[in-house]
Amino acid sequence: MKRAVCILFLAFAAAMPLKASEYKFDNFSANVTAENLEAFTKDMGGLLGSGTYSTGRILGWGGFLLSARAAVMPEPSEENTALGPDPEVMYMPWIQGEIGLPFRLDGFIRATSWDGLTLAGGGLKWGITRPVDTLYSFQTMITVMAQSGVHKDFSLTHYNANMVISFKMPVVTPYIGGGVDYTKLTVEGADNAALIGMREYTTTPRASAGLNFKLPAYIDLSVAANYANYGFGGEASLGVRF
């Protein structure tokens, strides 16, 4: 168990230096405009909604999962110049904890502090099918989540709902899912004072397809590609699961 937790901690620590040096939220105040705010909000919704699930199977009563997760947006959408005119890769890591509850429910919380943005939230997962580990069986679940974030130049509230299905195989479990992200963003600081207090509301679709691996020492690994407002992106999770 100690070894598994150490691996998880090191994986999260190793992800921290991945921050793109020229693509920071601190550039928001100098570059945000009334024209690019909507695209920025849509891209943030897709990024924050990524990585909510890594299989279609709920944990089940008494189950537990602690994971380090990350999502990547290779470049923003064309209209999103709110962090600068030159597109750069953007990462968002976080810690997510999940616990199995009665009535085919899982509860989870997630949190991060990254590039000046502090974000926290949580949600529920409901298994449409009962959790089983039978080979070549399908598992399906629905997830809902809410989270809020604060940066010195903007604040946001994000909600999403997803449906995911996975197929149990001997070594790997493929999964596909889709959902909707609803994001509200408020400008808190901008060089153009007329923008302060401006709010943007967006609703965008998102889809993902990935692979989940059960490794020795209770290690749970998943990698996936996703598609959101910004185009194709990626997400990954490394955790300890019981």
Which role fits each region the language model picked out?
Residues 7-15:
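Bacterial N-terminal signal peptides
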Residues 21-27, 201-203, 214-242:
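Predominantly the C-terminal beta-signal and adjacent terminal strand-loop region
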Residues 55, 95-101, 122-126, 161-167, ...:
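Residues on the lipid-exposed face of transmembrane beta-strands in outer-membrane beta-barrel proteins
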Residues 71-79, 112-116, 129-131, 145-153, ...:
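Sequence/structural signature of outer-membrane beta-barrel proteins
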Residues 142-214:
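Outer-membrane beta-barrel translocator/channel fold
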